[in-house]
Amino acid sequence: MNFQFTSKIKRNLFIIIAAGLVMFVIGFMGEKNHMYSTVETSEDGSESVLVEYYKELPFSKEEFISNVKSSASENGISVDFEDMTAHHAGEGHGESAHHDEFEFKMLLTPHALETEGSHDDAHGDEAHGDDHGSHGAVHHSPIETLEHILHEEGSFTDTGHARSWSNLLVNSFFFFGIGLGALFFIALQYATESGWGVVYKRILEAIIGWLPVGAIFLVFVFFAGSMHWNHIWHWMDPAVTDPTNAHFDPIIANKKPFLSQGFFWFMNVIYFAVFLLFARGFRKRSLQEDLEGGTKIHMKNFAKGALFLVLFGYLSSVMSWHWIMSIDTHWFSTLFGWFVFSGIWVSATIFILLLVFWLKGQGYVEFINESHIHDMGKWMFAISFLWTYLFFSQFMLIWYADIPEEVTYYLDRFGNYKWILWTTVAVNFVIPIVLLMSREAKRSKPTILIIGAILFVFHWVDVFILVMPGSVFDHWSIGLLEVGMFVSFLGLFIFVVLRTLSKAPLLVKNHPYLDENLHQHT
């Protein structure tokens, strides 16, 4: 029996996508173009900070200048302001300037330019500093301190729409990760010759069908970063690896063999080639097995599944370092790849169960019984624990070691992200252990639907927390822009999955373990 992708279902999904786009546009139009600052070196070697303000500022120019001077004085820095608004009026900046639209230079007095330590974390055009809190013997130059004051006293720079680009990365990675989790799961079942999951095979293949679409979104975000349309990955700015540049960062420069445009794109080709080719191969052989039968194709899938697991173990970790961990360029964790992997795997199992119950409500997949649902529920429960274990292991070791270059990652997240971070950890750990422990809960449709939906959203929030602190810093929000983009991606993701699901029978044929699986009762 095939799934019928009816016009009604398509229409409802288009409505969901459109509603998400409307929310996104409203949120996007409401973004404030607040502050943009860069450090410039003058001919005589002194430094100044050029700051441009645009519109919708929540304070007056005089109020802001007073606050910055006061904060700078507390840090032993003396600054003077040179108003540039009138100077640029003829260039289109100040033609309609008013109290909340202005531009000026901040001039540091000569003694303030004597630096203490190194410029730890300059990030090119939007020099913002990665260390927002001091730890141990970490020191900041007056330029860094002043930049920190600017971001504390003023509103965040979103001239390049960092919030929109960062959300695009969050959603692209989250939904691509679900497809990747399904690909890993089907390869795992092939390699272990599992019989319990045969009835889920076509659902897994349908979710894998998102990978080519998800790859397009990711490549677009990466290309935008390479072209400097966004500044999510600060190491992509050549200034930070140029010793003659004021923004030179020795830590990033030492990572250049790994964090370079050439190696980044070389590895991207490998990531996508391996994932997409294996996904296509598994699907092709699955359909071929329906027609031919026998064990030859099954044994080929067994070999390919084992090979994929080896490649995936390496590539999934390096992929997460390149795509996510390098956003916080100075920081690293050898456990990070496994933590990210556990998140995408559990998200995939959650979506599988939600989709199964929806299909059952539509009169499909009657061959999936309570025992099959119980088995998948056990995976959802177990991987939720794996996610929590890896989160705790990474956090505990970094916290206990108390090494400055490591704890800065959590210092950034213990600021304005503290409540959302701990809520995410609590939800993704407490809810499964309290509500999914029993056998009955893992078989219950209402329980799985409610808990699954909550966990699904909070694993999206988990990816949000991985990306945002290093790209928009403390100036995050979950508003119409975030909700709208998530809803649109979700609608498009479901559309692609259901479209793929409709192209083949819901139950495979000629699989060696099919009869065993159909009569499974536990």
Annotate each predicted stretch with a short phrase.
Residues E31-V39, A162, S172-E289:
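Transmembrane-helix bundle segments that line or gate the permeation/cavity pathway
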Residues T145-H148, K255-L421, L514:
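Long, contiguous internal "core" modules enriched in hydrophobic/ aromatic residues
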Residues L218, T447-V457:
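Central hydrophobic cores of alpha-helical transmembrane segments
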Residues T334-V340, E405-V425, F473-V497:
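Membrane-interface transmembrane-helix boundary segments in multi-pass integral membrane proteins
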